[in-house]
Amino acid sequence: MKINQWLLNTLSTTLILLMAGQLDAQSLSDISFGTDETFEVVTWNIEWFPKNGTATADSVGRIIESLDVDVLGLQEIDDTTLFRQVVNNVPGYELFIAEGWFGGLAYVYKTSTVNIQSIYKIYESSLFWNPFPRSPLVMELTFMGEDIVVINNHFKCCGNGLLDMGNSSDEEYRRYEASFLLKEYIDTNFSSSRVIVLGDLNDILTDNYANNVFKVFLEDPTNYRFADEEIASGASTDWSYPGWPSHIDHILITNELFGDLSNPGTEVQTIKVDDFMSGGFSSYDYYISDHRPVGMKIQVTPASVGFVEGSNTHIEIFPNPTHGKVSIDLTQCNAPTELSITDVHGKSIYTMRCPKGEVIDLNVEGPAGIYLVSLESGDTKSVTRLIKE
């Protein structure tokens, strides 16, 4: 039977419109990741935005608003004018887009929690175009009074899986060289700073040593760690790039954040936006991107935690971690003690003046997370971290 071509075209157009309607009707607004108690950062390649016109733009705006995170590092933004309109329609967020022929890198950040110190590109010279076809984009920011550095990247794609050291035309070597130069820059300029390196790094963490483009970081576990390493070595259903099943979008941290990474409330995950769309990943890939976002949320411990001045106070806190009830042993203190407990944002939870030489029993109210126990006794002051599970 011969089918009228006009009818086929009409049915095809109708199907696309119905899919778009389903997309609008689905629960993108139910996506969530950010909280008031944590710092959240997300890397997301949105595949030369907009992949499918206004449907893409509308959906990306809803996703950004629903994620409710502090910082998004984005790659592959083609229509910068349209993307700026999208972000302008998301309450409480601002946009920075890198300029340049092969840019496509951007930051979207929450203005109520993130104070930008500076944003700039590094390795811009033509000498570095081979390892960095897109110059890394550095954001120096302050979150709740704490300094954090984020470096957004989009490494060279493709290759054959074999690292040919010294071959400047080898894609794996170009990614290796980019990793080497990034580490060199961080070691030189941010040796004691909290640094988060993120982006579409276009390679997997689990390659053998000989072919691993990230070996310079993996060889220095004292100072660097991939926060998403468990995802990389886990089930393929959780990977960031399902079309060619692999996990190639990463979040790397420096040792100043190791403690925060292990704290209660920390989460690192591939955010499966496709789970909130009726067509699953096929619909997500059609309308939005072939990459899923990868996010990390942590409770940032103030840099002053652990600071002690004066003589040893011989104070013990137990159990630590706790589920709420805690005892603070002041029996070795020979003077009355001012005790205060705050959360990591400085909100007062408990204050009291304690007689010398007592054990104080308390119930720490509030959600699981990090609390700071401050004690002043005579001319001695200490700040100790208390973890509530």
Task: Give names to the regions the model predicted.
Residues 308-389:
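C-terminal outer-membrane/trafficking sorting elements
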Residues 1-27, 305:
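Bacterial Sec-dependent N-terminal signal peptides
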Residues 26-29, 80, 118-120, 129-133, ...:
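Metal-dependent phosphoester-hydrolase catalytic domains
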Residues 53-72, 134-238:
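Extracytoplasmic, non-cytosolic globular domains
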Residues 23-90, 100-104, 179-180, 194, ...:
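N-terminal, active-site-proximal structural segment of metallo-dependent hydrolase catalytic domains
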Residues 46-51, 68-76, 125-128, 164-173, ...:
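Second-shell loop/turn segments in exported
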Residues 45, 154, 199-200, 291, ...:
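Active-site glycine-centered loops adjacent to acidic/histidine catalytic or metal-binding residues
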Residues 71, 77-156:
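Structured beta-strand-rich core segments of catalytic domains in phosphoester-bond hydrolases
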